């Protein structure tokens, strides 16, 4: 049997842009994404602390430092300046669960890394 477990999290990131006319996804600063073990195309769940919205999308790696941009239809669920939690999950069996520790990255209001 497998269980969906927290794989990684970027905690309290700030939305820097929302692009309704893009195809979809969330663009995340590449360095930040890699530190959080997020990969291009990986499914993530976004939780907006300001308005309570919760939605799923996939990761695109961004070039701008500190960039967190929600794209496509999901751009209607956030506002620039909103604080979000970006979560990724992985399917794990009992042995993997026992050995796993989620990667948690804390950031400040400019999406600069505070702690990993």
Curated annotation (Swiss-Prot):
Q: Can you tell me which residues bind substrate?
A: 57, 72-74
Pfam families recorded: Asp_decarbox (PF02261)
**Catalysed reactions, semicolon-separated:** L-aspartate + H(+) = beta-alanine + CO2
Q: How is the cofactor bound?
A: Binds 1 pyruvoyl group covalently per subunit.
> Looking at the record's lineage, which domain of life comes first?
Bacteria
Active-site residues (renumbered): 25, 58
The record ties this protein, via Gene3D superfamilies, to: 2.40.40.20
Pyruvic acid (Ser) modifications at: 25
Q: Which UniProt keywords apply?
A: Autocatalytic cleavage, Cytoplasm, Decarboxylase, Lyase, Pantothenate biosynthesis, Pyruvate, Schiff base, Zymogen
InterPro entries the record matches = Asp_de-COase-like_dom_sf (IPR009010), Asp_decarbox (IPR003190)
Instruction: Provide the protein's localization.
Output: Cytoplasm
Explain the post-translational modification: Is synthesized initially as an inactive proenzyme, which is activated by self-cleavage at a specific serine bond to produce a beta-subunit with a hydroxyl group at its C-terminus and an alpha-subunit with a pyruvoyl group at its N-terminus.
Tell me its EC number(s), please: 4.1.1.11
Question: Which GO-annotated molecular functions does the record name?
Answer: aspartate 1-decarboxylase activity
Q: What does this protein need as cofactor? A: pyruvate
Q: In which pathway does it act?
A: Cofactor biosynthesis; (R)-pantothenate biosynthesis; beta-alanine from L-aspartate: step 1/1
Q: Which GO terms describe its biological process?
A: alanine biosynthetic process; pantothenate biosynthetic process
Q: Which GO terms describe its cellular component?
A: cytosol
Q: What does this protein do?
A: Catalyzes the pyruvoyl-dependent decarboxylation of aspartate to produce beta-alanine.
Instruction: Indicate the quaternary assembly.
Output: Heterooctamer of four alpha and four beta subunits.
UniProt similarity note: Belongs to the PanD family.
State what protein this is by name.
Answer: Aspartate 1-decarboxylase
User: Which organism's genome codes for this protein?
Assistant: Helicobacter pylori (strain HPAG1)
Taxonomic lineage from the root: Bacteria, Pseudomonadati, Campylobacterota, Epsilonproteobacteria, Campylobacterales
The encoding gene is panD
